[in-house]
Amino acid sequence: MKIPPFVLASASPARRRLLETVGIEPIVRASDFDESQIQLSEPAELVKTLAQCKAETVAPQFESALIMGCDSVLSMNGEIHGKPADTSEAIARWQIMQGNFGDLYTGHALIDLEQNRTIVKSQVTRVYFAQMSDRAILAYVATGEPLKCAGAFAIEGFGSFFVEKIEGCHSNVIGLSLPLLRHILAELGYDVTDFWQ
Protein backbone atom coordinates (compact mmCIF):
# COMPACT_ATOMS: atom_id res chain seq x y z
CA MET A 1 0.00 0.00 0.00
CA LYS A 2 1.32 3.45 -0.94
CA ILE A 3 1.87 5.63 2.12
CA PRO A 4 0.13 8.99 1.65
CA PRO A 5 1.31 12.30 3.11
CA PHE A 6 0.15 12.96 6.68
CA VAL A 7 -1.66 16.31 6.99
CA LEU A 8 -2.42 17.95 10.32
CA ALA A 9 -5.51 20.16 9.98
CA SER A 10 -4.59 22.23 13.03
CA ALA A 11 -2.75 25.41 13.91
CA SER A 12 -1.76 23.90 17.27
CA PRO A 13 2.02 24.04 17.74
CA ALA A 14 1.67 21.47 20.55
CA ARG A 15 0.06 18.89 18.23
CA ARG A 16 2.67 19.49 15.54
CA ARG A 17 5.54 19.18 18.04
CA LEU A 18 4.02 16.02 19.50
CA LEU A 19 3.89 14.35 16.08
CA GLU A 20 7.42 15.51 15.23
CA THR A 21 8.70 14.13 18.54
CA VAL A 22 7.51 10.65 17.54
CA GLY A 23 8.93 10.81 14.02
CA ILE A 24 5.92 12.03 12.02
CA GLU A 25 6.58 15.21 10.02
CA PRO A 26 3.10 16.45 9.17
CA ILE A 27 2.12 18.88 6.47
CA VAL A 28 0.36 21.57 8.51
CA ARG A 29 -2.79 23.14 7.07
CA ALA A 30 -4.72 25.06 9.69
CA SER A 31 -8.47 24.74 9.30
CA ASP A 32 -10.49 27.94 9.09
CA PHE A 33 -13.65 26.19 10.25
CA ASP A 34 -15.83 28.40 12.47
CA GLU A 35 -16.19 26.34 15.65
CA SER A 36 -19.04 28.53 16.93
CA GLN A 37 -21.31 26.88 14.33
CA ILE A 38 -21.38 23.69 16.42
CA GLN A 39 -23.28 23.74 19.70
CA LEU A 40 -23.42 20.34 21.40
CA SER A 41 -23.73 19.71 25.14
CA GLU A 42 -22.04 16.29 25.21
CA PRO A 43 -18.23 16.78 25.22
CA ALA A 44 -17.26 13.58 23.36
CA GLU A 45 -19.74 14.32 20.55
CA LEU A 46 -18.67 17.97 20.42
CA VAL A 47 -14.95 17.23 19.98
CA LYS A 48 -15.59 14.46 17.44
CA THR A 49 -17.83 16.74 15.38
CA LEU A 50 -15.37 19.64 15.50
CA ALA A 51 -12.42 17.39 14.63
CA GLN A 52 -14.27 16.02 11.61
CA CYS A 53 -15.35 19.48 10.44
CA LYS A 54 -11.75 20.73 10.67
CA ALA A 55 -10.43 17.76 8.66
CA GLU A 56 -13.20 18.08 6.05
CA THR A 57 -12.45 21.79 5.62
CA VAL A 58 -8.81 21.03 4.76
CA ALA A 59 -9.39 17.85 2.69
CA PRO A 60 -10.29 19.60 -0.63
CA GLN A 61 -6.74 21.02 -0.76
CA PHE A 62 -5.32 17.51 -1.36
CA GLU A 63 -5.82 14.68 -3.85
CA SER A 64 -4.15 11.91 -1.86
CA ALA A 65 -3.42 12.30 1.84
CA LEU A 66 -4.37 11.36 5.37
CA ILE A 67 -6.00 14.41 6.94
CA MET A 68 -5.98 14.55 10.76
CA GLY A 69 -8.38 16.91 12.52
CA CYS A 70 -8.42 17.29 16.30
CA ASP A 71 -10.29 19.29 18.89
CA SER A 72 -10.06 19.36 22.69
CA VAL A 73 -12.25 20.62 25.53
CA LEU A 74 -12.18 20.35 29.30
CA SER A 75 -15.40 19.16 30.94
CA MET A 76 -15.75 20.20 34.56
CA ASN A 77 -18.77 20.31 36.85
CA GLY A 78 -21.06 19.73 33.87
CA GLU A 79 -19.63 22.63 31.86
CA ILE A 80 -17.53 22.47 28.69
CA HIS A 81 -14.49 24.74 28.44
CA GLY A 82 -12.45 25.48 25.33
CA LYS A 83 -9.90 28.29 25.22
CA PRO A 84 -10.67 31.17 27.60
CA ALA A 85 -11.70 34.39 25.86
CA ASP A 86 -9.47 36.65 27.96
CA THR A 87 -7.34 36.85 31.11
CA SER A 88 -10.35 37.49 33.36
CA GLU A 89 -11.99 34.28 32.17
CA ALA A 90 -8.72 32.35 32.57
CA ILE A 91 -8.34 33.59 36.17
CA ALA A 92 -11.96 32.75 37.00
CA ARG A 93 -11.55 29.26 35.56
CA TRP A 94 -8.38 28.56 37.51
CA GLN A 95 -10.08 29.68 40.72
CA ILE A 96 -12.56 26.83 40.10
CA MET A 97 -10.05 24.33 38.63
CA GLN A 98 -7.45 24.54 41.39
CA GLY A 99 -7.81 21.65 43.83
CA ASN A 100 -10.42 20.07 41.57
CA PHE A 101 -10.45 17.68 38.60
CA GLY A 102 -11.84 17.68 35.08
CA ASP A 103 -12.07 15.44 32.05
CA LEU A 104 -10.07 16.45 28.98
CA TYR A 105 -11.74 15.21 25.79
CA THR A 106 -9.97 15.17 22.43
CA GLY A 107 -11.74 14.33 19.20
CA HIS A 108 -9.72 12.71 16.42
CA ALA A 109 -10.88 12.55 12.80
CA LEU A 110 -8.71 10.88 10.18
CA ILE A 111 -9.75 11.13 6.54
CA ASP A 112 -8.04 8.77 4.09
CA LEU A 113 -8.60 10.39 0.70
CA GLU A 114 -7.14 7.40 -1.17
CA GLN A 115 -9.59 4.93 0.38
CA ASN A 116 -12.42 7.47 0.73
CA ARG A 117 -12.79 6.54 4.41
CA THR A 118 -13.17 8.61 7.56
CA ILE A 119 -12.70 7.40 11.12
CA VAL A 120 -13.77 9.61 14.01
CA LYS A 121 -13.12 8.77 17.67
CA SER A 122 -12.59 10.51 20.98
CA GLN A 123 -10.39 9.94 23.98
CA VAL A 124 -10.86 11.20 27.55
CA THR A 125 -8.25 11.75 30.26
CA ARG A 126 -9.04 12.78 33.82
CA VAL A 127 -6.83 15.62 35.05
CA TYR A 128 -6.36 16.48 38.75
CA PHE A 129 -5.29 20.06 39.41
CA ALA A 130 -3.14 21.27 42.30
CA GLN A 131 -4.25 23.64 45.05
CA MET A 132 -3.01 27.07 43.98
CA SER A 133 -2.63 30.44 45.64
CA ASP A 134 -4.12 33.52 43.99
CA ARG A 135 -0.54 34.63 43.32
CA ALA A 136 0.23 31.40 41.43
CA ILE A 137 -2.97 31.69 39.40
CA LEU A 138 -2.19 35.30 38.42
CA ALA A 139 1.42 34.43 37.58
CA TYR A 140 0.36 31.48 35.43
CA VAL A 141 -2.26 33.46 33.54
CA ALA A 142 0.31 36.27 33.05
CA THR A 143 2.48 33.84 31.04
CA GLY A 144 -0.24 33.89 28.36
CA GLU A 145 -0.19 30.10 28.09
CA PRO A 146 -3.74 29.50 29.44
CA LEU A 147 -5.21 31.74 26.72
CA LYS A 148 -3.88 29.44 23.99
CA CYS A 149 -5.18 26.13 25.34
CA ALA A 150 -8.42 24.24 25.75
CA GLY A 151 -9.16 24.11 29.46
CA ALA A 152 -6.82 27.06 30.14
CA PHE A 153 -3.73 24.92 30.76
CA ALA A 154 -0.91 23.18 28.89
CA ILE A 155 0.42 20.00 30.49
CA GLU A 156 3.57 20.30 28.37
CA GLY A 157 4.29 23.87 29.54
CA PHE A 158 4.10 25.99 32.69
CA GLY A 159 0.78 24.28 33.43
CA SER A 160 2.60 21.03 34.22
CA PHE A 161 3.47 22.48 37.64
CA PHE A 162 -0.24 22.63 38.48
CA VAL A 163 -1.31 19.14 37.36
CA GLU A 164 -1.09 16.72 40.30
CA LYS A 165 -1.85 13.61 38.27
CA ILE A 166 -3.79 12.25 35.33
CA GLU A 167 -5.77 9.08 34.71
CA GLY A 168 -5.50 8.02 31.10
CA CYS A 169 -3.50 9.04 28.06
CA HIS A 170 -0.90 11.79 28.59
CA SER A 171 -0.58 12.77 24.92
CA ASN A 172 -4.36 13.17 24.77
CA VAL A 173 -4.03 16.08 27.20
CA ILE A 174 -1.52 17.70 24.82
CA GLY A 175 -4.15 17.46 22.10
CA LEU A 176 -3.64 14.19 20.22
CA SER A 177 -3.72 10.67 21.65
CA LEU A 178 -0.81 8.78 20.10
CA PRO A 179 -2.17 5.33 21.09
CA LEU A 180 -5.55 6.21 19.57
CA LEU A 181 -3.84 7.49 16.40
CA ARG A 182 -2.00 4.15 16.14
CA HIS A 183 -5.32 2.27 16.41
CA ILE A 184 -7.03 4.49 13.82
CA LEU A 185 -4.13 4.04 11.38
CA ALA A 186 -4.31 0.26 11.88
CA GLU A 187 -8.05 0.34 11.19
CA LEU A 188 -7.23 1.99 7.86
CA GLY A 189 -4.58 -0.65 7.09
CA TYR A 190 -1.46 1.35 8.00
CA ASP A 191 1.28 0.76 10.53
CA VAL A 192 2.31 3.85 12.47
CA THR A 193 5.95 3.04 11.66
CA ASP A 194 5.16 3.67 7.97
CA PHE A 195 5.00 7.37 8.81
CA TRP A 196 8.26 7.64 10.77
CA GLN A 197 10.87 9.89 9.21
Curated annotation (Swiss-Prot):
EC number per UniProt: 3.6.1.9
Cofactor: a divalent metal cation
One GO CC term, this protein: cytoplasm
Function: Nucleoside triphosphate pyrophosphatase. May have a dual role in cell division arrest and in preventing the incorporation of modified nucleotides into cellular nucleic acids.
TM region positions: none
One of the record's GO molecular function terms: nucleoside triphosphate diphosphatase activity
InterPro entries documented for this protein: ITPase-like_fam (IPR029001), Maf-like (IPR003697)
Listed GO biological process terms: nucleotide metabolic process
Places the protein is found: Cytoplasm
Name of the molecule in the record: Nucleoside triphosphate pyrophosphatase
Claim: Hydrolase is one of the keywords in the record: yes
NCBIfam families for the chain: maf
Enzyme class (EC, first level): hydrolase
Alphabetized UniProt keyword annotations: Cytoplasm, Hydrolase, Nucleotide metabolism
Family assignment from sequence similarity: Belongs to the Maf family.
HAMAP family in alphabetical order: Maf (MF_00528)
Catalytic residue positions: 71 (proton acceptor)
Substrates-to-products reaction catalysed: a ribonucleoside 5'-triphosphate + H2O = a ribonucleoside 5'-phosphate + diphosphate + H(+); a 2'-deoxyribonucleoside 5'-triphosphate + H2O = a 2'-deoxyribonucleoside 5'-phosphate + diphosphate + H(+)
CDD domains hit by this protein: Maf
